[in-house]
């Protein structure tokens, strides 16, 4: 039966250790400045992240003006807008401590309706919009993960070390070609188990089979220049997503992707106009799950062991039977 390697109190202390170390190194190595972030945005702005395009944001109206607001799913679009508003230049970027509510999340060991992540965004020049630049950025972030594991091992040697020296890059099409009989999720399990750490490139567009590896909103990532960082989780014995990131759409790719998804109505939103008219800067960015990170590096079996959220009674009871104690 599962046995946590730390008490709840020890876990809380270690969570701070994980977050403090990672935040400090992320800012230094990607040259990012921390900024304050909104919990909600106006509906008409189009700044909310609509994820896979089907999740419902929490909406409410403001008493003062009656304006409709949405609690954010993530800050994928807001960050790009902020870089423009704050006058950042190529090579400069920002990050923020993002908290969100995703009401339609299907709850399980790795998914909660409460989301906490380091959301970051950086301005790039046109010639940087390449797979090579994407991979270089992934390697920088992976280097932080490696150093974090080493740092924790010095304090908590019983946590062990599992990450390989290098992260492996593979495209979603290469995965389909390699494992045509498997579902996309099972392909992720297979490749993560084989290598320990992988970055899957190209998520959102249809593969040669006609199926997508996974859904992505049409209006933030360029589907050819994005991907997910996956580790093999030693406790769950499955693939484990730590980050979704990518080079963002330019006017050409946004135009193409909105057409593919049948979302031409979004062209009228301020955010989308800013991209289509080349007003907003070209960027790369992503979200790095804080609770996911703590769950992996502290070797936890459930995300509820590293964050406070709301869980159905039957799920709490099932966890108790497995010796999993949720916050």
Swiss-Prot record:
Protein family according to the UniProt entry: Belongs to the class-II aminoacyl-tRNA synthetase family. AsnA subfamily.
Protein name (database record): Aspartate--ammonia ligase
EC number: 6.3.1.1
Keyword check for Ligase: yes
Keywords: Amino-acid biosynthesis, Asparagine biosynthesis, ATP-binding, Cytoplasm, Ligase, Nucleotide-binding
InterPro entries reported in the protein's UniProt record: aa-tRNA-synth_II, aa-tRNA-synth_II/BPL/LPL, AsnA
Top-rank lineage group of the source organism: Bacteria
SUPFAM superfamilies assigned to the protein according to its UniProt record, in alphabetical order: Class II aaRS and biotin synthetases
A GO molecular-function annotation: transferase activity
Subcellular location, record wording: Cytoplasm
HAMAP family (alphabetical): AsnA (MF_00555)
Record has Hydrolase as a keyword: no
GO process annotations (BP): asparagine biosynthetic process; L-asparagine biosynthetic process
A Pfam family: AsnA
Matching Gene3D superfamilies: Bira Bifunctional Protein, Domain 2
Pathway(s): Amino-acid biosynthesis; L-asparagine biosynthesis; L-asparagine from L-aspartate (ammonia route): step 1/1
